[in-house]
């Protein structure tokens, strides 16, 4: 499923997005963010992060730099170090 979602995002980025003007208010763009989020966090969490990002991408949001959050490590593994 992850590969299918990433392929759909790639198709959008290279086939559909060039036909429209650049409307994303964020860096990286929403499609780049979605690709990175799903690649990093998996389909479920990455998909949720992508949907939240798309919800923030509107004319009343100032936008700006909004990177994909890093993977959270468990407390027990960081305490063992």
Swiss-Prot record:
<keyword id="KW-0997">Cell inner membrane</keyword>
<keyword id="KW-1003">Cell membrane</keyword>
<keyword id="KW-0472">Membrane</keyword>
<comment type="function">
    <text>Could be involved in insertion of integral membrane proteins into the membrane.</text>
</comment>
<dbReference type="Pfam" id="PF01809">
    <property type="entry name" value="YidD"/>
</dbReference>
<protein>
    <recommendedName>
        <fullName>Putative membrane protein insertion efficiency factor</fullName>
    </recommendedName>
</protein>
<feature type="region of interest" description="Disordered">
    <location>
        <begin position="59"/>
        <end position="81"/>
    </location>
</feature>
<dbReference type="InterPro" id="IPR002696">
    <property type="entry name" value="Membr_insert_effic_factor_YidD"/>
</dbReference>
<comment type="similarity">
    <text>Belongs to the UPF0161 family.</text>
</comment>
<dbReference type="GO" id="GO:0005886">
    <property type="term" value="C:plasma membrane"/>
</dbReference>
């Amino acid at each position: 499923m992850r590969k299918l979602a990433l392929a759909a995002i790639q198709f959008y980025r290279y086939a559909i997005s060039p036909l429209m003007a650049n409307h994303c208010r964020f860096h990286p763009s929403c499609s780049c963010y979605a690709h990175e989020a799903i690649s990093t966090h998996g389909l479920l969490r990455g998909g949720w992060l992508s949907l939240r990002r798309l919800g923030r991408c509107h004319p009343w949001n100032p936008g700006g730099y909004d990177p994909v959050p890093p993977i959270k490590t468990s407390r027990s593994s960081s305490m063992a170090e």
